[in-house]
Amino acid sequence: MKRVLTALAATLPFAANAADAISGAVERQPTNWQAIIMFLIFVVFTLGITYWASKRVRSRNDYYTAGGNITGFQNGLAIAGDYMSAASFLGISALVFTSGYDGLIYSLGFLVGWPIILFLIAERLRNLGRYTFADVASYRLKQGPIRILSACGSLVVVALYLIAQMVGAGKLIELLFGLNYHIAVVLVGVLMMMYVLFGGMLATTWVQIIKAVLLLFGASFMAFMVMKHVGFSFNNLFSEAMAVHPKGVDIMKPGGLVKDPISALSLGLGLMFGTAGLPHILMRFFTVSDAREARKSVFYATGFMGYFYILTFIIGFGAIMLVGANPEYKDAAGHLIGGNNMAAVHLANAVGGNLFLGFISAVAFATILAVVAGLTLAGASAVSHDLYANVFKKGATEREELRVSKITVLILGVIAIILGVLFENQNIAFMVGLAFAIAASCNFPIILLSMYWSKLTTRGAMMGGWLGLITAVVLMILGPTIWVQILGHEKAIFPYEYPALFSITVAFLGIWFFSATDNSAEGARERELFRAQFIRSQTGFGVEQGRAH
C-alpha cells in the first residue's frame, strides 16, 4: 500500500489535472444502489439533452462548435467541466489527506497555465481559427505539413488521455459502485460515443456544464459541512487535523513531494504550457461568437476552477479529521477502506449520509463522461477536419467531412474500450504525464510562435515541433517512471520524472534555428504574410460570427 501511495504522489500532478487514472490496486466495494440510481438519472437526462442537440446539429459548424452560439459564461462552465476531473476531486483531496499542505500547492498549480491562455492565446486563437488549433498554426504556413503535425500532436495527446481515462473510469467505478471493471469501461465508451456521435459539441458542452454545476455543488456542500464542524475557523480546522494525523505538525510543511529544483521547475513548466496546448481545451474557444466572449470564457473558467481547488483543500483536511480518525472507515489492517483515493467519498458519507454518498459517487462518474466526450470530439475533428478535409481530400463537402468525423468517433470509442480492457492491470499514470509533456513541447510552441513571431516558417515549425514531440517521448521512456518502475531496470538513464523543461527547450530552439536559417522563397513569403495575420488576430476582421462562424 505504501508503494501505491508513493506512486500516486509522484504521478498525481499530471493525473489529477485531466485524467482519472486511479493508480494501484483497488478494493471493490459493495453495490451502491443510491449511486447507481442517481447516475441513471444523470444518464437519462444527458441522453435527453443529446437527443435535443441532435435536432439542432445541421452543419459542420453546429457539430464542431455548437454554431458558435455558446456564451462566455456557459463556455467558462464547460471549460471547467472539461478540466476538473474525478482525479482532481478524489486525487487532490487524497493528497491533502496523506501529505497536508503540499496538496494545496499542487491544486493551485493547476491554475498557472490559465493566465497564459487568457492573456496570450484565447483572443487571437478565436480570431484566427474556426474548428481546431491547426487552423491557427497553418494560417500563413504550409497547410499540409503543419496540419499533419498538429493532428498527430492532438491525436497522441487524446489517445494517451483516453486510455488513462478509461482505465481510471473502470477502477473508479469498481471502487464507487461495486460494478465489474469491464462493464464499467464498456458503459463509459458507449455513452461517450452516443454523446459525441449524435449531439456533437452542443451535447458535449451541456454535459460538461451540468457536470461542473453538480461537482461544484457537491464540493461546496462538503466544504461547508467541514467548516461548520470547526465553527468556520481555519485555525480550528488545521489544529484538529494536526492533532489526529500521524505526521502531526509536519502536514503543514511544504516541499515533500518534489525531489529537487529541476523536477519542480520541469513539473511547473509542463503544467503551465501543457494546459495551453491541450486540444480539447483549445477547441472550446471556437464555440463562442467572438474574441471578447473567448476572453470571458477563460475568466469564468479560472474563477470556477480556483474555487474548486480551494474546496478540495478544505475537503482533504476535513477527511483527516472526520474520516482518518474514525475507525468506521478503516479495514482490519488500519488502512482506509478502498484506499486513500476514497477519502473524499468517505467524507461525503460522514457529512451527508448514504444519500449524499450516492450523489458524490454519481458525480464522479459524470465527471469522467464529460472529460472523455470532449477528448473524443477533439480527436475526431483532428482526423476529419485537419487530415481528411484539408490534406487528403481537399474540397470535401461538409457531409463527407461529418461522415468521416462520426466514423472516427466510433473507431476512437472502440479502440478506447479495447485498450481500457487490455491496460486494466498496467501502470498507466505515466501516459497522462506524457500527454502533458507532448502538449507543452509540440502543440504549445507552434501555437504561440505562429501567432507572435513574424519570422516563423513552415520548416522551423515542422522541425521544432517534431523534435519537441520526440524528445518528450524519449525522455519519458528513459526516465524513472517507465525505465525503472515499468520496464524493471535498476537505474534510469534520464534522472528526472518530468521531461517538459528539456523537451520544451528543444522545441523552441529547433523552431528558432530552422526558421532563422530558412532562406527559401517560401519562407520569405510566409514572413510577409505575418502582417495580415496580425491584423486579423487583433481585430477579428474577416471572422464569420454566429451561425456563419
Curated annotation (Swiss-Prot):
It comes from the Bacteria. Pfam families: SSF (PF00474). Keywords: Cell inner membrane, Cell membrane, Ion transport, Membrane, Sodium, Sodium transport, Symport, Transmembrane, Transmembrane helix, Transport. It is found in: Cell inner membrane. The keyword Magnesium does not apply. GO terms for cellular component: plasma membrane. The keyword Cytoplasm does not apply. One of its GO terms (biological process) is sodium ion transport. Residues 56-75, 126-145, 206-211, 284-302, 382-401, 451-461, 517-549 are cytoplasmic. Residues 1-32, 99-102, 169-182, 235-260, 326-358, 425-427, 485-493 are periplasmic. It is a multi-pass membrane protein. One of its GO terms (molecular function) is glycolate transmembrane transporter activity. Coiled coil: none annotated. The chain crosses the membrane at residues 33-55, 76-98, 103-125, 146-168, 183-205, 212-234, 261-283, 303-325, 359-381, 402-424, 428-450, 462-484, 494-516. Belongs to the sodium:solute symporter (SSF) (TC 2.A.21) family. NCBIfam families: PRK09395.1, PRK12488.1, sss, symport_actP. Transports acetate. This is Cation/acetate symporter ActP. It comes from Escherichia coli O157:H7. The gene is actP.
